[in-house]
C-alpha cells in the first residue's frame, strides 16, 4: 500500500453504466487504492461490477478492495476486503483470502478498536467520520488527533468521512496515509473525477513525506 487517494465507490453517485469509467478516471488521476462498496444491487450484478473493476484496477496496478464481502472478494480475485465492526471477523476473512490479502478495518473514533484490529492482523486502520458525511451521517465523529495517536500501531492509517480537497490537507498533516473519499471524488463527471484525483495526489505529494508518484502516472 502506498500513501494517497483511496477511491470509494457509491451506487447512489455512480449508476452501473458509469461505474467503471468513473473508477478509471480516478485511477488516471492517481488513486492508489479503490474500494467497491455496493450493497443494494442483486448478487449477479455485483459480481459483474466487481469483475470489471478488478480488470480496471489490475490494468492500473492498483489494489481493488471489496467492502464487507470476503466471499465476493475471493470469487473475483480482488486484492482484499474492508470490514466494518458488524461484518465478518478479521480471522475469518484472513482464513478465506489468505495471508497476501489486504484487510482493512473500520475503527470509527476508537483507539481500542484499532488496537483490537491491529492484534487480529488488519493491514490498515480506518478512522472517521472527520467531517459531516452524507454517506454515513450517523457514524461517530472523530478528532484528527486520533490519526496521530494511531501512528503508534505502525500500520497505514486511513481517514474517511466528508473529505474534500478543502479539508484533506489537515488530515494528512495529522497522520493519514490514505484519504478514503466518496462524494468528494465521485460527485461529478469523469473529467472532474480525474482532476480531483490529481489534486488529491498533489496534496499527498506536498504534505506526506512518503508519497511517491504511482507507476501508472510516471
Where are these regions (language model features)?
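Conserved N-terminal beta1-alpha1 strand-loop-helix module at the mouth
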Residues: 1-90, 95-123, 139, 149, ...
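Feature marks short, surface-exposed loop/turn motifs that line or immediately flank catalytic pockets
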Residues: 40, 131-134
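Phosphate-binding beta-alpha-beta segment of Rossmann-like dinucleotide-binding domains, i.e.
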Residues: 127, 134-137
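Internal alpha/beta core interface subdomains
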Residues: 177-178
Amino acid at each position: 500500500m502506498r500513501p494517497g487517494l483511496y477511491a470509494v465507490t457509491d451506487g447512489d453517485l455512480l449508476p452501473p453504466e458509469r461505474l467503471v469509467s468513473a473508477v478509471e478516471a480516478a485511477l488516471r488521476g492517481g488513486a492508489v487504492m479503490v474500494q467497491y462498496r455496493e450493497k443494494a444491487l442483486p448478487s449477479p450484478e455485483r459480481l459483474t461490477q466487481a469483475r470489471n473493476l478488478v480488470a480496471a484496477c489490475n490494468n492500473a496496478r492498483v489494489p481493488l478492495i471489496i467492502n464487507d464481502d470476503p466471499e465476493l472478494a475471493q470469487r473475483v480475485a480482488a486484492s482484499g476486503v474492508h470490514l466494518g465492526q458488524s461484518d465478518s471477523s478479521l480471522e475469518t476473512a484472513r482464513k478465506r483470502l489468505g495471508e497476501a490479502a489486504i484487510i482493512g478495518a473500520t475503527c470509527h473514533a476508537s483507539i481500542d478498536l484499532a488496537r483490537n484490529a491491529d492484534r487480529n492482523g488488519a493491514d490498515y486502520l480506518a478512522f472517521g467520520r472527520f467531517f459531516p458525511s452524507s454517506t454515513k451521517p450517523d457514524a461517530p465523529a472523530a478528532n484528527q488527533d486520533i490519526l496521530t495517536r494511531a501512528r503508534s500501531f505502525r500500520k497505514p492509517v486511513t481517514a474517511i468521512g466528508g473529505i474534500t480537497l478543502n479539508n484533506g490537507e489537515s488530515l494528512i498533516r495529522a497522520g493519514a496515509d490514505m484519504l478514503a473519499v466518496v462524494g468528494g471524488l465521485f460527485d461529478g463527471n469523469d473529467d472532474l473525477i480525474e482532476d480531483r484525483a490529481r489534486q488529491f495526489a498533489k496534496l499527498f505529494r506536498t504534505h506526506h513525506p512518503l508519497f511517491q508518484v504511482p507507476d501508472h502516472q510516471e
